[in-house]
Design a protein with these regions (language model features):
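HhH-family (HhH-GPD) DNA N-glycosylase catalytic core used in base-excision repair
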Residues: 14-265
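Generic short N-terminal amphipathic or hydrophobic helices
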Residues: 6-7
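Generic cytosolic/nucleocytoplasmic N-terminal low-complexity/intrinsically disordered segments
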Residues: 10-12
Length: 265
């Protein structure tokens, strides 16, 4: 499913029917107010800023995004544990197989529905990716020659499910793939105090898709941007298209805007 083929681009006259000047002003002001370094203090994006090396930042971002569900006070310590075990050298920790010592291959709970076995197999598949392609960045460049976010999301879904790993990375893009969309926001958006922007030359940030969850859905509905409470890639693309009307060169600035609107209201 590709945003460019599933979303009908509305003309400017129709745009005015779902987005008035007040809504546009509210979202632009909220984006400016909340996309700051302080945002990192309570966001899992914080962890990817800790490693010094570029490819360690990539791996930390990928793992942190995959772990980011549920209550932050519960999953933050789990991400911190991985950072501590690796001593911030994520690539070396995975390639050396040291993760197998720190996260033994058993059925004990690691975090919520993720057992140690699930995490172990996930990290093993990530290890295979790093061995085969050299880095997450090179994987992205290889699988997204069209520079589109949806192409790379599909590639991640396919790669991590080739060997039956279906618990952490979605099987396909029927779901909203929230955590993969969030990971790509982190990696692609440039000139941000929050996002790294390391892959801005690989993925066109105009093709990024909003990480869709119940909170985003709620605020988007309150503003009249969408009229559904379901989460799917189709809905994520629809909302992203609306945000692109406000932020043409950087639609995921709207992610901060909706967050800020929710806080303010």
């Amino acid at each position: 499913m590709d945003c460019s083929t599933t979303i009908i681009v509305l003309n400017s006259k129709l745009s005015e029917s779902y987005m008035n000047n007040k809504t546009i002003r509210i979202l632009k002001e909220a984006a400016l107010l909340y996309e700051t370094k302080d945002f990192l203090l309570k966001d899992p994006a914080l962890f990817m800023h800790i490693p010094k090396e570029k490819h360690d930042k990539e791996v930390m971002a990928f793992i942190a995004s995959c772990m980011s569900y549920g209550r932050r006070e519960l999953f933050f310590p789990k991400i911190q544990n991985i950072l501590d075990c690796s001593k911030t050298k994520l690539v070396q920790w995975i390639l050396s197989g040291n993760y197998e010592h720190d996260i033994p291959d058993n059925e004990q709970s690691f975090y919520r529905l993720y057992t140690n076995h699930i995490m172990n197999r996930f990290l093993y598949r990530l290890k295979q990716l790093l061995i085969t392609y050299g880095s997450l960045e090179k994987f992205a460049a290889y699988y997204a020659p069209d520079h589109k976010a949806i192409t790379l999301i599909k590639a991640f879904c396919s790669y991590f499910n080739e060997v039956g790993q279906t618990h952490i990375i979605p099987k396909n893009t029927q779901s909203s793939c929230k955590r993969l969309c969030m990971f790509l926001r982190w990696m692609v958006r440039k000139d941000s105090p929050v996002d790294l922007g390391l892959w801005n030359d690989i993925i066109d940030q105009r093709t990024l898709i909003i990480p869709l969850d119940t909170h985003v859905i709620q605020e988007a509905n309150r503003l009249g941007l969408i009229k559904t409470k379901s989460t799917s890639m189709k809905v994520a693309c629809e909302l992203t298209e609306k945000l692109r009307k406000i932020f043409p060169e950087d639609p995921l600035k709207g992610d901060f805007a909706l967050f800020g609107y929710g806080i303010n209201n």
